[in-house]
Amino acid sequence: MSPSPFAPTIETIDYPFPPKPIPLSDAEKADYKARIKQLLIEKDAVLVAHYYTDPEIQALAEETGGCVSDSLEMARFGRDHPAKTLIVAGVKFMGETAKILSPEKTILMPTLEATCSLDLGCPIDKFSAFCDAHPDHTVVVYANTSAAVKARADWVVTSSIALEIVEHLDSEGKKIIWGPDRHLGSYIAKQTGAEMLMWQGDCIVHDEFKANALRDLKRVYPDAAILVHPESPASVVAMADAVGSTSQLIKAAQTMANERFIVATDRGIFYKMQQAAPGKTLIEAPTGGNGATCKSCAHCPWMAMNGLKAIEASLSDSDKTTHEIFVDEDLRVKALIPLTRMLDFAKTLNMKVKGNA
């Protein structure tokens, strides 16, 4: 499908990458882990971590009775868990989603500075104006968005259910505004044939995967299956043996007969993917072409901010304003409507909704 003449133009944004956490010694790591475990008990808190956080953070979440998953499942786990406080190791929109589903709970994050290029690239004022210019369109937004953008939408979707929802809306003759990920939107439009106006955002990690370099790597490992997240460019998706959400890619590595996999998504997923597929070889898909020109290099710089020191600080700091997530109640109620609409639709399909990045 050719780009709509009414779609916003693609702007090159120089995102302000955060500094990487200072490496800790083994002794410091052990001390922080012990302190965090004690504080979780004292504060009646549970730690949930996204697939893209560093392996030691995912392991700590599992060791302490928390969970490792995609952002929506993290929020649902926190909602259903008896703990009064939820520590969200991820990026800011994930904390907001948790607060939308659990307004009565305290939602803390290791740092409120951990954001997302999809969130930054879809400011509510510009996106709302875009929607207002096309009032006859149904607004569908990816879960990787702010609470304000969700509140402006008719539907919120994850990558695991986006195809089904767009097919449903298209069957009803609905014209669709899609935001913010242009690659995922283009993939869905191609699969469904739906008429969609695209917001022109992208994930800095997935946007860097390169088809030519991937083709070269495939020549080195001809027996490897290529697993691709649909936030990747169309030329990369076209080379995939399996395309899917985070949880769907983990399942593919577990169930496919191949012994090797080239994986085009954030390398943080390797922790859970290796658990699900022990003995199989996982290979990073190339970013930035054949030269050392990548910026994210297959790992989200904001996810990397969720270090042990920051998690300990979120539990021990007396000043919670640097860690606590707040969502205006009117905004929360509005954002809950399209989220609930998705969850109710999933029930009609008898499927568990997972898979936003």
From Swiss-Prot:
One of its GO terms (molecular function) is quinolinate synthetase A activity. [4Fe-4S] cluster binds at C116, C203, C300. Catalyzes the condensation of iminoaspartate with dihydroxyacetone phosphate to form quinolinate. It comes from the Bacteria. The gene is nadA. SUPFAM superfamilies: NadA-like. It is an enzyme of class 2 (transferase). Keywords: 4Fe-4S, Cytoplasm, Iron, Iron-sulfur, Metal-binding, Pyridine nucleotide biosynthesis, Transferase. Gene3D superfamilies: NadA-like. Belongs to the quinolinate synthase family. Type 1 subfamily. Its EC number is 2.5.1.72. This is Quinolinate synthase. Iminosuccinate binds at H50, S71, Y142, A143, N144, S159, H229, P230, E231, T246. GO terms for biological process: 'de novo' NAD biosynthetic process from L-aspartate. GO terms for cellular component: cytosol. Pathway: Cofactor biosynthesis; NAD(+) biosynthesis; quinolinate from iminoaspartate: step 1/1. It is found in: Cytoplasm.
